[in-house]
Structure formats: C-alpha cells, structure tokens
Amino acid sequence: MIANQAAETPRKVPFYRHLYVQVLTAIVAGIMVGNFYPDLGASLKPLGDAFIKLVSMIIAPVIFLTVTTGIAGMADLKKVGRVAGKAILYFTVFSTLALAVGLLVANILRPGAGMHINPATLDPKAVAAYATNAHGTTAVSFLMKIIPNTIVGAFADGNILQVLFISILFGISIAMVGDRGQPVVRFLDALTEPMFKLTAVLMKAAPIGAFGAMAFTNGKYGIASLINLVMLIGTFYLTSLLFVLVVLGAVARCNGFSVIALIAYIKEEILLVLGTSSSEAALPGLMAKMEQVGCKRSVVGLVVPTGYSFNLDGTNIYMTLASLFIAQATDTPLTLADQILLLLVAMLSSKGSAGITGAGFITLAATLSAVPSVPVAGMALILGIDRFMSESRAITNLIGNAIATLVVANWEGDLDRGRMTVRWPGNQRWTKFNNKMFKLERGFRAPTVDVDCFGAGPAQP
C-alpha cells in the first residue's frame, strides 16, 4: 500500500529541467556570446531562424484542428457569431486604448524633443521598401487576402487568417450536417492530441533557438548602438509595462484573475518570445495553456488566432509613440486634430499587419503615409533601433491576447473556474493578496475573485 502511494507521488522536477529556466539561460548565454564574440554571434542567426520555421510549420494545423473541432462541437451555431462579436468588441476597445496610451505618454515624456532633425537631410531610400509595401496594404486588399486562392495554398503559405477562415467555414459545415459529421469530428479530435504532443517536442528546441537569435542580435547591432535613441526605447518599454500592469491589470481584476499570476503562468511563452522576437513562436503553446486553464476550445480557437491580427496592443503603442517621436525629432508641430487623425488612421492600418514580415514597421509606414503632418522620411531615424523594440511589442501582444481569451471566455460563461483553481493555483494566491492590499489601501471590502465588472454575471463553476 505504502509502496503504491510512493509510486503514485510525482517526483519533483529539478529546476534546470524547466523550459523557462533553459530558455532564460540560453538568452543570457546568447547575449554574452554576441557581446564578446560578435562575429561568432552574428553567424548563429540560422539557429533562431530554424526554430521559428519549426514552430511556424505546426501553427496552421494546430489552428485548423482547434477551431474546427471547437466550432463543430457547438450545439448552437449562433454562439460562434456571439463569441466572434464579443472578441471584436474587446479587440477594438483595447487596441484603441493602447493607441491612446502611446499618444499620452509621448506627449508627457517627449522622447524626441531637442533633436532638431531637418527632414530634408534624411535618406528616404532607407524606408522606401517599407513605404511601398505599406501603400500596397489597403483595407480592401487586406480583406481580399483573407480568402485563399486554394485550401492547400493557405496551409502551404502558413497564412493565419486564411487558415482561420477555412477552419471556421469547415467547422460550421460539420455542425450543419449533424450526426453525419461526427466521424469527422472524432477523427480531428484524435489528431489534436498528437499535434499538441508534437508542439511540446518542438518546444524542447526553444533554448537553442533563443540562444542563436540573441547571439545574432547582440553580435550584429551591439549594445552601444542603443545609446543615441535609448530614450525612445526606454519610453516604449515603460509604456508597454504600464499598459500591461494598469490597463490590462484592471480588466483582469474585473474578470476574477491576476495579470501578475497570468504572466507567471505563461512565463515559458514570454521567454520564448523574448528570445525569438516572434509572438507567433508562442501561439501553439498559448492556445494549449488557455485550454488547460479552463477556457473552452471553441473560444480559444476563435479568439487567439484572430487576436494575432486584430489585438496587437504592443504594436499599437509602438505606432503612436514612434509617430510622435518622429514629429518631435523633426520639430513638426501636431495639433490636437492632427493627433486625433493619427489615432483614427492607426486604428484602421493596425488591422492589416497580419502575415507581413516586419509588421510593426510596415504598419507605421502605412499610418504615416496617410497622415500628411508627419514626414515619412523620419522613419529613417528609428529604422536602426526598431529591432530592439520588437521584443516588447511581441510580449505585450502575447499577454494582451492571453487576457482577451480569458475575458471573452468569462463573458460567455465558458471559463471553468474549478479547473482554473486546480490548474492555476498561483492565480488564487495573487488574487487573495491583491484583495488584502485593496482593503488596506481603500478601507472597505475588496471584490472577490468572482467579481465581473462587465456584467457577464457570476463566474461559472
């Protein structure tokens, strides 16, 4: 009996076996190699590229299986539209808030003031390729690109929105044929588990990819290259941190979970993004963790992939902050009307950045091209440091989409609180701590973890 109990007791995993420890160690090692042996570091770029390609290889099938089985399993097809509508509402509100926060911080800290750059002295050729690409990305062309030429082509290109489009239509079609579609659902369900197992296997190569990517970045660009524009970089990182902790922290609290606990829960994915500068690298792992923590697969399958195109909080902060930096650096005065126009244009242009290499910089070019007040040539000022801000953009986007998934699941009553308690005990500890601090600071009873500020009703058991 005792022997059986001992056999059932799981052994404690050594700290060095945890993926986040391995990735963090690899990042530090990559920085050191790139700093002390820059030529060697620059030559290690293929390691990071290879890992991103490995992960990109499985993104399309993971999305297809998750979305299709999730929608096909819905008894009420109206729920698909309801979930999608709530997700788009959330994306619109918080993407706009991210743009507004970027504007506010740029006006207060003024990171570009005092540079007195003459736009005529800048080389417009340095950003010509980005501007050309941006001009080709209109709202109509973006919507047309969602529809693939062929089903196979969408998977071959790895276009997230096209795969999502096919998955939604196929899932609805399976649900419409009723019982005759159940063999297909069972087959796809059987494929889902080994696909997520493959994801876990590929994640074991994350430390190698992070090491190569960080060694290349530090070896090629160097730390000294940050000095002249460190104010902009620091302002962007600070703004992203404040947005996550204050704005997203508030909406998390209103929906019964802690943003700090969430960050701890997805730390492996955050470190992976930090090492590779690609939020897509963490997409399969994020989808798996959101489902494990209690979100229904149907919600996860709709919200996470869609959020990667429509809920880019980090990119939105970057766009307005960088736009005002360029205006301040070139002594270009912007009235309140100009800044409102910038905000409105950015709201539209930010929705067309999915599937584009260098999406943040290209989207910035698209925004400035439509706002005559800010010189597009001024983008040459930040071209060299854009790479150093990509990590913060990607991490903020990742956290924003994780919170969006939990919030929409809570609004729909599709968040299993019992499962969350078991799978995510850290959330209970942080929430209780926050409630105690709230009582001490405010002098009245703090909301419990079941509080819902958005009228979605009590949390589901």
From Swiss-Prot:
Cellular component GO terms held in the UniProt record: plasma membrane
Record's keyword terms, sorted: Cell inner membrane, Cell membrane, Membrane, Symport, Transmembrane, Transmembrane helix, Transport
Compartment(s) of residence: Cell inner membrane
Keyword flag Ligase: no
Pfam families documented for this protein: SDF
Membrane-spanning segments: 20-37, 52-74, 87-109, 151-173, 194-216, 226-248, 340-362, 366-385
Kinase is among the record's keywords: no
Its job: Responsible for the transport of dicarboxylates such as succinate, fumarate, and malate from the periplasm across the inner membrane. This transport system plays an important role in the energy supply of rhizobium-legume symbionts.
Family: Belongs to the dicarboxylate/amino acid:cation symporter (DAACS) (TC 2.A.23) family.
Name of the protein described by the UniProt record: C4-dicarboxylate transport protein
Organism: Neorhizobium galegae
